[in-house]
A protein has these predicted regions:
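Bacterial N-terminal signal peptides that target proteins for export
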Residues: 1-6
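N-terminal signal peptide c-region/cleavage motif recognized by signal peptidases
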Residues: 12-17
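Catalytic loop of the DD-peptidase/beta-lactamase superfamily, centered on the K-T-G motif
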Residues: 20-56, 188-201, 205, 239-519
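Active-site-proximal loop and beta-strand segments within enzyme catalytic domains
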Residues: 39, 62-177, 184-185, 191-193, ...
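Conserved beta-strand in the GNAT
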Residues: 59
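Short coil/turn segments at secondary-structure boundaries
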Residues: 141-146, 171-173, 215-219, 278-280, ...
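Short, structured active-site-proximal loop/turn typified by the sulfatase FGly-forming signature C/S-X-P-X-R
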Residues: 210
Length: 519
């Protein structure tokens, strides 16, 4: 696959909106092509804004593997969690309208709102919804909408009240998506509009984001849209179906292009001012969104080559990540979606912005491109970020392989299940997710999540009363251990799950589930 992406086909698949490439970006073409070859990325779009001007917006490669349609500046990609800044902006606009205050209690706007702890329910503010300090664990509750489920937004928010808290309220950073489903409801309640209508009329139309779509459901026939790609079983690159996320669009639903995201960056870097000089939002609102609320622990680099990227401070504001690089404050976010990942980075002190959109799942690709662009403008010692991130990816794969080898070495291969297979067949219920069904089929077992069509697969015996679920959809890369615990009478008491690979996306939060038999 690398040979195809790095070969002659890609030379005919680049487009560029502006005729002259700035001197600082003369090497960008070669960098992007190296990234595509190194990380097997079919298509990439990049836009760069400097001093109020769009200095580059361009596409490389193809929208879909094996098809000739090129990625262009107008090609739509899922921007996933880069949507969070739009949600935060929407709430600040409503604050400017006098419809709410950011420190209002959520329950004052949504009386039915509940967290699993009554104290947190009563104290949670609108600002808390945006800043990842609720006490929820990483990705808690994501299985209510990831992969696509049949739950509505209202059902997701209602079920939030059963998702357990694992930390203290406002105690530490833990990234979540589910509280943005609540933020979506607050916007609708305060504005009297749907979240989609609010985004369209108050942001997209005013900024000039004509091609941007509310979510995958709103892509139109003939839209210039990229197709997502994933490595099935972490190996073979193929296309994947888009996630339908209308039940939590506030966390990550938007599809946009390099062209439209450049307009968004222009507004951000102009303290909320639009092209005509009027204000989308005030400088005060921007200051609030860009102010650190929740500090983050800064991890050590996985390989020495990534050390120059390590921040001196890191935290989260309202819909934005905050850190530093080469003496400059960065305001940024990433987005991850089945088959697509992206990164938007602002350097306010240099009036610089860069967005990288890709139709593959390797974050190393957008990081290598982003840091290469930042280096070109900020100066200092040159660094080979493509090589550095390639080594980081390899290290991550090695660690995952070692963990799997340890599982295999510790496996009791001679053990047998305690029950006949039919003894495990039942409907099981988790308080926040709902039902999981295990059925006996032929000589084996199958497992399916009742509200998630993609989570259906066969159970393969591992040891004792532990199985591995092998999902039918091999693009998920989320196979999991399924452990049945028995009571003294030899009946299943509870079922717990755990992803088998460290590389599985954190949104597959199987470890937060506790299933018990439905009586």
């Amino acid at each position: 696959m690398k040979t195809w992406i790095g070969g002659a086909v890609l030379l005919a698949c680049t487009t560029m909106a502006n005729a002259a490439t700035p001197q600082q970006l003369q090497d960008l073409d070669a960098t992007v092509e190296r990234v595509r070859a190194q990380f097997d990325v079919p298509g990439i779009a990049v836009a760069v804004v400097k001093d109020g001007q769009v200095v580059l917006e361009r596409g490389w490669g193809v929208r879909e593997l094996g098809k000739p349609a090129p990625v262009e500046a107008d090609t739509l990609f899922a921007i996933a969690s880069n949507t969070k800044a739009f949600t935060a902006t929407s709430l600040n606009l409503l604050a400017e309208d006098g419809k709410l205050k950011m420190d209002d209690k959520v329950i004052d706007h949504l009386p039915s709102f509940r967290m699993s702890d009554p104290f947190v329910t009563g104290q949670m503010t609108i600002r808390d919804l945006l800043s990842h300090r609720s006490g929820l664990s990483l990705g808690a509750g994501d299985l209510l909408f990831w992969p696509t489920t049949s739950y509505s937004n209202a059902e997701v928010v209602q079920r939030l009240g059963q998702v357990p808290l694992k930390g203290g309220f406002r105690e530490r950073y833990a990234y979540d998506n589910i509280l943005y489903a609540v933020a979506q409801q607050v916007i609708e309640h305060a504005s009297g509009m749907s979240y989609q209508q609010f985004l369209q009329t108050r942001i997209f139309d005013k900024v000039g984001m004509a091609g941007t779509r509310y979510n995958a459901d709103h892509l139109k026939a003939g839209d210039n849209a990229a197709v997502g790609h994933a490595k099935y079983d972490f190996k073979d690159l193929r296309t994947v179906a888009p996630l339908t996320w209308s039940n939590n669009a506030g966390a990550g639903g938007i599809y946009s292009s390099a062209h439209d995201m450049a307009r968004w960056m222009q507004v951000q870097l102009a303290e909320g001012k639009l092209a005509d000089g009027t204000a989308l939002f005030t400088a005060k609102s921007q200051q609030q969104m860009w102010q650190m609320i929740t500090p983050q622990t800064i991890p050590a680099p996985s390989v020495p080559e990534l050390a120059p990227a390590r921040a001196n401070f890191a935290g989260y504001g309202e819909g934005w990540s905050l850190s530093d690089y080469r003496g400059q404050k960065l305001v940024w976010h990433t987005g991850g979606w089945p088959g697509m990942v992206s990164r938007l980075t602002l350097v306010p002190g240099e009036k610089l912005g860069v967005v990288v959109l890709t139709n593959q799942e390797v974050g190393a690709a957008f990081n290598a491109i982003t840091l290469s662009v930042l280096d070109a403008y900020l100066g200092g010692e040159k660094h080979d970020w493509v090589d550095a991130y390639a080594k980081g990816v390899a290290k991550g794969q090695d660690k995952a392989d070692e963990a799997w080898a340890k599982h295999q070495a510790e496996r009791d291969k001679g053990s047998r299940p305690s029950l006949p297979l039919a003894g495990y067949a039942a409907t099981y219920r988790d308080r926040w997710y709902g039902d999981m069904v295990v059925t006996a089929e032929g000589k084996g077992l199958r497992l399916r999540f009742a509200k998630t069509a993609q989570l259906s697969g066969r159970l393969e015996h591992w040891q004792h009363d532990t199985f591995i679920v092998r999902w039918d959809d091999r693009s998920l890369n989320a196979d999991a251990f399924v452990n049945f615990s028995l009571d003294p009478d030899g009946k299943v008491r509870e079922v717990r799950m755990q992803p088998i690979s460290d590389l599985t996306d954190f949104s597959f939060d199987f470890q937060d589930l506790l299933f018990t038999p439905v009586k």
